[in-house]
Amino acid sequence: MKDNIVTIDGPSASGKGTLARNIAKYLGFEILDSGLLYRVYAYLYDCGIEHAQITETINQDITFKSDESGIVVLKEKNNITDELRKESTAKAASKISALLETRENLMLLQRGFYSPKGLVADGRDMGTVVFPNACLLYTSPSPRDS
């Protein structure tokens, strides 16, 4: 596996997150949920933080922790995971992800999740754009399409 990175690309609600957690647990790798990272970005933008400061804010004030139920997100030690899972945050993330500035800012952050012990990254363009040298898995929402 090149660079010890496994990426799982696919559309929303195709099982990427569950597959990524299971593979990461099995291999002992770190995990990156890029959709959650986009939600954090949208959440911070909605809190009034400008694009130019969001990456720095994420690096300084946001902590990602894995547990049995998935990834927990802390902002200055306050759990904001439930806020990030709200439909309104998902819609905001979808809108903001269409902006080139957002995608460019997040690409460096996403690449920063790499760990020498390995990484499983899930998202719509993880293997095609963010980690092009990774082992790529593609999921489909329909078992027939896989």
Give a label for each model feature.
Residues 8:
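Hydrophobic anchor at the beta1->P-loop junction of P-loop NTPases
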Residues 138-146:
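Single conserved hydrophobic/aromatic residue that forms the stacking wall/gate
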Residues 11:
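P-loop (Walker A) phosphate-binding loop of NTP-binding proteins
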Residues 17:
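Walker A/P-loop
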Residues 14:
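ATP-binding Walker
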Residues 26-32:
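Post-Walker A helix-loop "phosphate-sensing" segment adjacent to the P-loop in P-loop NTPases
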Residues 36-119, 128-130:
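ATP-dependent small-molecule kinase phosphotransfer cores
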